[in-house]
């Protein structure tokens, strides 16, 4: 039976009154009881911006509306105690977006990006010497962490991804058709921040393995939301010199006037809304999805109806709209003089306020509360854990007892706790989950059953993680994702044993897939992976610089092998198996593997995040022949005027071979040489070319399968450098 969700925080409205064009048929419209808390949060943010950053119109045309502010109707399921800080964060997003759009040179995106990435890793943002924007972001993190640390971290990660996208996106203007424009516009709709705010506000946790699937489900919703924004903002934007708006593009595409353009756009909005209404219905009845994912999709439908109603009356899009009386008083005198009116003094809403304060409790908070007094529900009492490993028995020196043990076949079992501990350690580190996203996005085409897809994800993640354990050991890497490498905690022997155990486990999973070809595919790609790694180690140990061709073949075998295994296993388990060969997706896997590896080579040398997570220019410590280093060496060899630099580089690489690492000063010398040979610029240019080829390959596959793949394109966009 499809679940029905409690709606204690809102009241149902007659959508037909507020949606005369019937844009969101089939979706209810609800209004939050704690609407006033949204206004308070928005005004607090505006006041802080003026105090910490600079001037701002009063009131600012952000999320506020005279009848309905945005969250009030777009997230009617928001837990009341989370409404104010959620609104504060959203208003900051509105203000910051306007700064980017109007004054890109003043946007301080790098500072914001760095701060949010710090928040995503640590749960706090350093404010010392920070910009006003970063101080505000730190305030948001503090308030959210005090309420729900687990989901506050999701907000920080999602927001950081959104800022990163804004900083790196390419401004495109020459769209000829609506279908060309929609993918670009949908990426720009602010979904990444909105995802974090909704999951925080409603206390939802999406399992990592279902995140990419959620993005796929939301494709028509993001399309509809972005087109609704364009529909209502066109009046404000239509005289802009560089207008980017769906109404304008429809007019240009069909050679029609504004009235017809609007009607055509409304028809497309209704079409996308209907798609999402069906997705909401289908999702509720699925047995292979978590309850939180189902609830998330259900909650997101109100974003669509709420967005329509808010857009129709908000001052952000309607320049003649007037603020309500309380909003004008708060804008003039501040929220300190006109504080929140919720919950009302008569106690009429106390029942939902109290319900909200416990319903939204995160798992971590619940465990913490339970451990204060009594059993903590894990493996101990009052927060004191029992040892993870217990001894088999008490040692005895009595001959008869020892002989009895030696002859017994009924000894206690040894658990897998010890062999799994190094693996559990590395998997506890933060991961971006690109491989899971790749599986889910590719499955948009292959329709591989959920049970098989889950197993394939496990196989790929086991192999990838085990490879990282061995790579770090073989390269003598001190850090992995900012923490000590596994072998530096558990030692080389236990690390090798634990990694090898994962390979055997993954083999068993591959053998358990329904298509017997899967084990053959698994073995073929594992062999490729080991051979590729052998060349990487051989070149490093013997200080042999490979050719570009040798390097790329090694990458195809080592890095591309896992992506190739992923696509081949999914194809083998797909109901389309008879219609497509297991090599159909090989070009995509090959390009992704090359792009990933060369991107990793580049980031290792230039990224501050990589330096924090792995150490400064760590590839040079390892003596690894990266794409950039190969270009540098080959350029030096071809240019006699750089003979001195060539000799110096060779001496430094030999020094690394003898001492096992390089000083930071030596690494900076090598980076200076790379600047002379323009090797970093060359690598970046190759990455951009590869990304273009990847985009073309995705387009080829979209035509072949007859289905656009928004999730895959979003993943590729996030990887762009």
From Swiss-Prot:
Pathway membership: Secondary metabolite biosynthesis; terpenoid biosynthesis
The protein's Enzyme Commission number: 4.2.3.145, 2.5.1.29, 2.5.1.81
Keyword Lyase: yes
Highest taxon listed in the record's lineage: Eukaryota
Residues given in the record as Mg(2+) 2 binding sites: 97, 101
Entry keywords, A to Z: Isoprene biosynthesis, Lyase, Magnesium, Metal-binding, Multifunctional enzyme, Transferase
Any one Gene Ontology BP term: alcohol biosynthetic process
Cofactor, free-text remark: Binds 4 Mg(2+) ions per subunit.
Motif DDXXD 2 per UniProt: ranges: 471-475
Ranges where the record places region Disordered: 348-387
Motif (NSE/DTE): 229-237
Catalyzed reaction equations: isopentenyl diphosphate + (2E,6E)-farnesyl diphosphate = (2E,6E,10E)-geranylgeranyl diphosphate + diphosphate; isopentenyl diphosphate + (2E,6E,10E)-geranylgeranyl diphosphate = (2E,6E,10E,14E)-geranylfarnesyl diphosphate + diphosphate; (2E,6E,10E,14E)-geranylfarnesyl diphosphate + H2O = ophiobolin F + diphosphate
Pfam family, one: Terpene_syn_C_2
Entry annotated with the keyword Metal-binding: yes
Residues binding substrate, per UniProt: 97, 185-188, 229, 233-237, 316-317
Its job: Bifunctional sesterterpene synthase; part of the gene cluster that mediates the biosynthesis of the sesterterpenes ophiobolins, fungal phytotoxins with potential anti-cancer activities. The first step of the pathway is performed by the sesterterpene synthase oblA that possesses both prenyl transferase and terpene cyclase activity, converting isopentenyl diphosphate and dimethylallyl diphosphate into geranylfarnesyl diphosphate (GFPP) and further converting GFPP into ophiobolin F, respectively. Other sesterterpenoids (C(25) terpenoids) are found as minor products of oblA.
Name of the featured protein: Ophiobolin F synthase oblA
Originating organism: Cochliobolus heterostrophus (strain C5 / ATCC 48332 / race O)
Lineage, uppermost ranks: Eukaryota, Fungi, Dikarya, Ascomycota, Pezizomycotina
């Amino acid at each position: 039976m499809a679940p029905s969700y409690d709606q204690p925080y809102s009241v149902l409205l007659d959508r037909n009154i507020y949606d005369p064009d019937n844009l969101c048929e089939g979706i209810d419209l609800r209004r939050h009881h704690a609407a006033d808390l949204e206004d308070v949060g928005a005004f607090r943010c505006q006041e802080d911006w003026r105090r910490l950053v600079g001037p701002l119109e009063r009131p600012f045309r952000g999320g506020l509306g005279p009848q309905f502010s945005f969250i009030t109707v777009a997230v009617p399921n928001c837990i009341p105690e989370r409404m104010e800080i959620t609104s504060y964060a959203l208003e900051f997003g509105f203000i910051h977006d306007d700064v980017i759009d109007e004054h890109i040179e003043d946007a301080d995106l790098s500072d914001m990006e760095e701060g949010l990435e710090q928040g995503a890793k640590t749960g706090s943002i350093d404010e010392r010497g920070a910009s006003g924007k970063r101080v505000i972001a730190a305030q948001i993190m503090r308030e959210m962490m005090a309420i729900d640390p687990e989901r506050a971290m999701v907000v920080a990660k999602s927001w950081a991804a959104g800022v990163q996208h804004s900083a790196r996106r390419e401004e495109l203007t020459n769209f000829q058709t609506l279908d060309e424009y929609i993918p670009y516009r949908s990426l720009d709709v602010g979904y990444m921040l909105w995802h974090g705010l909704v999951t925080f506000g409603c206390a939802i946790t999406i399992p990592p393995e279902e995140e990419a699937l959620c993005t796929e489900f939301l494709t028509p919703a993001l399309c509809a939301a972005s087109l609704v924004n364009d529909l209502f903002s066109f009046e404000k934007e239509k005289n802009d010199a560089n207008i980017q708006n769906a109404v304008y593009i429809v007019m240009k595409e069909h050679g029609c006037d504004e009235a017809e353009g609007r009607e055509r756009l409304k028809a497309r909005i209704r079409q996308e809304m209907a798609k999402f209404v069906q997705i909401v219905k289908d999702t509720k009845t699925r047995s292979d999805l978590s309850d939180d994912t189902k609830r998330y999709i259900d909650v997101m439908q109100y974003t669509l109806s709420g967005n329509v109603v808010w857009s129709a009356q908000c001052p952000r899009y309607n320049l003649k709209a007037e603020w309500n009386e309380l909003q004008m008083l708060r804008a003039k005198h501040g929220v300190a003089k006109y504080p929140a009116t919720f919950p009302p003094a008569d106690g009429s809403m106390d029942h939902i306020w109290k319900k909200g304060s416990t319903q939204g409790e995160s798992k971590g908070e619940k465990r913490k509360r339970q451990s204060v007094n009594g059993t903590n529900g894990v493996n101990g009492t009052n927060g004191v854990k029992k040892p993870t490993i217990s001894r088999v028995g008490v040692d005895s020196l009595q001959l008869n007892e020892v002989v009895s043990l030696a002859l017994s076949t009924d000894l206690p079992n040894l658990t897998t706790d010890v062999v799994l501990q190094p693996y559990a350690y590395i998997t506890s580190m933060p991961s971006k989950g690109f491989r899971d996203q790749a599986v889910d996005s590719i499955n948009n085409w292959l329709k591989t059953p959920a049970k098989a897809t889950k197993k394939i994800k496990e196989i790929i993640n086991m192999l990838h993680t085990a490879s990282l354990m061995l790579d770090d050991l073989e390269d003598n890497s001190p850090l992995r994702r900012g923490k000590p490498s596994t072998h530096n905690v558990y030692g080389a022997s236990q690390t090798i044993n634990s990694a090898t155990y994962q390979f055997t486990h993954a083999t068993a999973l591959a053998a358990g897939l329904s298509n017997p070809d899967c084990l053959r595919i698994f073995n073929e790609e594992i062999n490729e992976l080991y051979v590729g790694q052998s060349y990487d180690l051989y070149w490093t140990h013997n200080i042999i610089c490979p050719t570009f061709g040798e390097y790329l073949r090694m990458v195809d075998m080592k890095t591309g092998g896992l992506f190739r295994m992923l696509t081949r296993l999914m194809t083998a388990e797909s109901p389309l198996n008879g219609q497509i060969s297991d090599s159909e997706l090989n070009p995509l896997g090959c390009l992704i593997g090359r792009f990933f590896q060369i991107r990793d080579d580049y980031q290792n040398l230039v990224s501050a995040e990589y330096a924090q997570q792995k150490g400064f220019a760590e590839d040079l410590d390892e003596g690894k022949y990266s794409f950039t280093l190969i270009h540098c060496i080959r350029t030096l060899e071809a240019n006699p005027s750089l003979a001195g630099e060539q000799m110096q580089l060779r001496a430094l690489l030999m020094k690394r071979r003898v001492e096992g690492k390089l000083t930071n000063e030596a690494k900076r010398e090598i980076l200076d040489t790379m600047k002379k040979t323009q090797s970093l610029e060359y690598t970046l240019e190759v990455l951009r070319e590869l990304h273009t080829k990847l985009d073309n390959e995705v387009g080829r596959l979209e035509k072949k399968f007859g289905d656009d793949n928004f999730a895959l394109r979003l993943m590729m966009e996030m990887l762009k450098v």
